[in-house]
Swiss-Prot record:
The lineage of its organism: Bacteria, Bacillati, Bacillota, Bacilli, Bacillales. Keywords: Acetoin catabolism, Oxidoreductase. PANTHER family: ACETOIN:2,6-DICHLOROPHENOLINDOPHENOL OXIDOREDUCTASE SUBUNIT BETA, PYRUVATE DEHYDROGENASE E1 COMPONENT BETA SUBUNIT. Pathway: Ketone degradation; acetoin degradation. InterPro entries: THDP-binding, Transketo_C/PFOR_II, Transketolase-like_Pyr-bd, Transketolase_C. This is Acetoin:2,6-dichlorophenolindophenol oxidoreductase subunit beta. It comes from Bacillus subtilis (strain 168). The gene is acoB. Its EC number is 1.1.1.-. NCBIfam families: PRK09212.1. One of its GO terms (molecular function) is oxidoreductase activity.
Length: 342
């Protein structure tokens, strides 16, 4: 039976179901058991991290499976990688994806390489949950969107859900996966609500989803920007333009077939990605389509991304920094040779 719950609650529920199903699943990270650096809280008062996503887990599973750590991403990420390589299935919470630089070796040079280095005999079934994205008024060091960086690393899988239903099913699939999976959660979407079944279900990694069908243009959007694209598609529909909104859901593995199937209908592609443009997912998808699907195109590929600057702290500048429905509508009208917005 489906209920309407938030993205945060859907992610929380996925972790609970996974931990109930498999005693080898554990949670490790800063403040995942307690409140944000508040040592005196009792377990029955624990907030569940700075954003409350792990609330209630320590009460049900105890502190042997829900582990608070010191402020050392290198330390607990190394411990989690080691635990995964010896048979456990840790969920490691990296509070902000901006902090990944402190544990590059553990993730990129160790965990991502084990299966390959040991001829496929080693498994590292770790899920790294982390937050990304601007719009939270958190300034340059807590607002980056770094999923493209991890997508470029062989041996890592990357998942970026856009809604509560997908978040639950994709997280359960990630936890079941025998390779390291980075699961990116948009901070500003935690309160987004949608219908989510109560039971245990998975969504296969590497399977895209068409969030809205259309014949005039394909809007390939990543994570939170799927919802921005849907808003733009609704506005375009009022002008008689039907945009297809394609949500990749996972970036590695990537559902290339879904992209080309959509382009066979629309023959036009706009990529919406809130990360910086250089060496980004937007750039990669554009190159992929240019290499393998050029004959499907009736117009140039367009990209709508953040500028190549750090995320500004000023709310006015931050709002301009991100893709918006109006930006998407304007680029679409230009691509189709339609009159511009007034």
């Amino acid at each position: 039976m489906a209920r309407v719950i938030s993205m945060s609650d859907a992610i929380n529920e996925a972790m609970k179901l996974a931990m109930r199903k498999d005693e080898n699943v554990l949670l490790i990270g800063e403040d995942v058991a307690g409140g944000a650096a508040v040592d005196h809280l009792q377990d029955d008062e624990a907030w569940g991290g700075v954003l409350g996503v792990t609330k209630g887990l320590v009460q049900e599973f105890g502190r042997t499976r829900v582990l608070d750590t010191p402020i050392s991403e290198a330390g607990y990420m190394g411990a989690a990688m080691a635990a995964a390589s010896t048979g456990l299935r840790p969920i490691a919470e990296l509070m902000f994806n901006d902090f990944i630089g402190t544990c590059f070796d553990q993730v990129i040079n160790q965990g991502a390489k084990f299966r390959y280095m040991f001829g496929g005999k080693a498994q590292v079934p770790i899920t790294v949950r982390t937050t990304y994205g601007a719009g939270f008024r958190a300034a340059a060091q807590h607002s980056q969107s770094l999923y493209g960086l991890f997508t470029s690393i062989p041996g890592l899988k990357t998942v970026v859900p856009s809604n509560p239903y997908d978040a639950k099913g994709l997280l359960l699939a990630a936890i079941e996966d025998n390779d390291p999976v980075f699961f990116f959660e948009d901070k500003t979407s935690y309160n987004m609500k949608g219908e989510v079944p109560e039971d245990y279900y998975t969504i296969p990694l590497g399977k895209a989803d068409i969030k809205r069908e259309g014949n005039d243009v394909t809007l390939f959007a990543v994570g939170k920007q799927v919802n921005t694209a849907l808003e733009a598609a609704a506005q375009l529909s009022e002008r008689g333009i039907e945009a297809e909104v394609l949500d990749p859901r996972s970036l590695s593995p990537l559902d290339e077939d879904a992209i080309f199937t959509s382009l066979e209908k629309t023959n036009r592609l706009i990529i919406i990605d809130e990360a910086n443009p250089r060496c980004s997912i937007a750039t990669d998808i554009a190159a992929l389509v240019a290499d393998k699907g050029f004959d499907l195109l009736d117009a140039p590929i367009k990209r709508i991304t953040a500028p190549h600057t750090p995320v500004p702290f000023s709310p006015v500048l931050e709002d301009q920094y991100l893709p918006t429905p109006d930006k998407i509508v304007s680029v679409t009208l230009e691509l189709l040779g339609e009159p511009a917005l007034n």
